[in-house]
């Protein structure tokens, strides 16, 4: 009897991953953590682990070369790769890079791309140690594998959040998404007008940098360790705050309350959102690609977190039965919903 057809959109990104990997079970004792977290953790010695992550980026889905400079793209690829390692509270050390190269690309384009890769590697202190190249008939394809190390006792998984833990966030949200929307707007406006007209980016340079050249928060791993803080759970913001909170809740079997008035938004984010008639809260919740860190810590560490001065406490963990919700200033709650990848949204995420 023939199998029925199930559309990928019916499952969504996270449902698809669960579906494809449900039958896989770890067989090796050296596998500490497999599918289901930001990265895999593999035993390296009695007290240390190697952390490994891989990511793919496809032209026309994850980036548009009509407005993405190759140097910035190379930088962003490294950020995307090592951010998953950082989200495990590990220190990134090496990357490998494999490319599918279309005939429309030139050697000069690739030189610029690798210049961006080199700059990001130097900045983060990681080594490019290998990779592969192949021809592509579907545009530029990029795959990065990032490797890091950490003590087993210092790794933060998505599954460790406990009721009453504080929910903490580095940086601000929504800036990358608004940078993307700005680029898309100017591209549409300028189509067919020729090179004599320049795009209007003045006043929104920060948003462009957050989208085109984001920086992984590897600095926070060192800051947390200096304070003796090991997050009970952690994840990086790649699919938007709502998706990441729900991922922690799912893995930790808990609920969450995020307070709207505590969500950090940059001035340029709110200004452009108002100009484009976009709710900045939606940009923060579902925009993604901020590459900030969302993590939880026990309530008794509140003073240490506050003293760091670069982290916002935006909510707390609750019982699983309460679900995950956004709390508005008047005290009402709105259930959080994940965005993630679907074929309909792939070109704008």
Ranges and model annotations:
Residues 196-247:
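Polyanion-binding loop/helix "lid" in catalytic or ligand-binding cores
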Residues 1-69, 88, 97, 346-349:
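Extreme N-terminal cap/leader segments of soluble proteins
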């Amino acid at each position: 009897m023939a199998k029925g057809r199930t559309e990928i959109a019916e499952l969504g990104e996270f449902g698809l991953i669960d579906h494809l990997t449900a039958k896989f079970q770890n067989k090796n004792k050296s596998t500490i953590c497999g599918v289901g977290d930001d990265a895999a953790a593999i035993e390296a010695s009695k007290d240390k682990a190697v952390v490994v992550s891989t990511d793919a980026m496809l032209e026309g889905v994850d980036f548009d070369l009509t407005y993405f400079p190759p140097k910035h793209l190379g930088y962003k690829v490294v950020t995307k790769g090592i951010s998953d390692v950082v989200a495990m509270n590990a220190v990134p050390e090496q990357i490998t890079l494999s490319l599918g190269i279309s005939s429309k690309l030139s050697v000069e384009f690739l030189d610029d791309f690798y210049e961006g890769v080199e700059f990001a590697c130097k900045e983060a202190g990681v080594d490019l140690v290998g990779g592969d190249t192949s021809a592509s008939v579907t545009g530029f394809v990029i795959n990065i594998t990032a490797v890091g190390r950490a003590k087993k006792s210092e790794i933060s998984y998505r599954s460790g959040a406990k009721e009453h833990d504080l929910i903490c966030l580095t940086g601000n949200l929504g800036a990358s998404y608004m940078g993307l929307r700005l680029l898309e707007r100017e591209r549409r406006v300028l189509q067919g007008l020729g090179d004599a007209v320049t795009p209007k980016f003045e006043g929104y340079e920060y948003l462009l940098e957050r989208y085109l050249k984001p920086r992984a928060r590897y600095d926070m791993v060192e800051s947390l360790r200096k304070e003796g803080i090991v997050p009970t759970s952690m994840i990086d913001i790649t699919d938007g705050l709502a998706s990441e909170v729900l991922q922690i809740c799912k893995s930790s079997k808990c609920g969450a309350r995020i307070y709207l008035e505590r969500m950090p938004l940059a001035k340029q984010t709110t200004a452009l959102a108002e100009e484009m008639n976009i709710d900045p809260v939606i940009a923060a919740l579902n925009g993604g690609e901020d590459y900030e860190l969302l993590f939880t810590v026990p309530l008794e560490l509140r003073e240490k977190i506050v003293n760091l001065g670069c982290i916002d406490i935006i909510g707390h963990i609750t019982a699983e039965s309460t679900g995950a919700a956004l709390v508005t200033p008047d005290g009402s709650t709105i259930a959080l919903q994940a965005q993630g990848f679907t074929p309909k949204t792939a070109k704008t995420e």
